[in-house]
A protein has these predicted regions:
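Acidic/His-rich, divalent-metal-binding segments that scaffold phosphate/diphosphate chemistry
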Residues: 1-99, 117-122, 140, 173
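Histidine/acidic-rich helix-loop-helix segments that form or flank divalent-metal centers
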Residues: 51-57, 92, 98-145, 149-173
Length: 173
């Protein structure tokens, strides 16, 4: 019997969560990949840390998998953000080897201009995740015909989002 490696764990998680909600899993994979590319471009973290943060990015909406809310992704990404953030934080903190990074999930919907009110060793990555998450959410909504103000991300720079992740997103390939 072979040892399970991180690639196997990723595949198991994706296949399992995809059976519950393909839409949420697709969003999670896009956000995780975007976060990976931003951190890779930033070149400030070890590959091991980038992989851990990418897994957190993929699991950032794990709290949505409570059966009564999983089908309402857009509502929980735009309006009711704290319930799934708290559930996701608890999942990561108590049921995963990434417990030291659970606060990233808890705060991934916190406005950037409120970061000074909390203590976390991961606020920089949290800011990157928040941008990647919102960017994919608005991109998906725009594709469905919902009008998304083109200047939203510029208007919200350093209010809702840190300017740094937007800079990284625009430059990372």
């Amino acid at each position: 019997m072979s040892v399970i490696n991180s690639s196997d764990v990723y595949k198991i998680i994706c296949k399992t969560l995809n059976t519950v909600s393909a839409k949420v899993m697709r969003h999670s994979q896009i956000v995780g990949y975007t976060l990976f590319k931003m951190l890779q471009y930033e070149n400030e973290y070890s590959l091991e840390d980038i992989i851990d943060y990418t897994m957190v990015g993929i699991l950032h909406d794990i709290g949505l998998y409570r059966t009564e809310i999983v089908g309402r992704l857009a509502d929980y990404e735009l309006n009711n953000v704290w319930e799934h953030s708290v559930y996701g934080h608890l999942f990561l903190r108590y049921l995963s080897p990434l417990k030291d990074k659970a606060d990233i999930i808890l705060y991934h919907h916190l406005d950037f201009n409120k970061y000074s009110q909390i203590q976390s060793d991961h606020l920089k990555v949290c800011a990157h995740l928040a941008y990647a998450d919102k960017h994919d959410t608005y991109h998906r909504l725009h594709k469905t015909g919902m009008p998304v103000p083109r200047i939203y991300f510029e208007e919200q720079k350093n209010i809702t989002f840190s300017a740094r992740p937007q800079h990284l997103f625009e430059r990372a390939d």
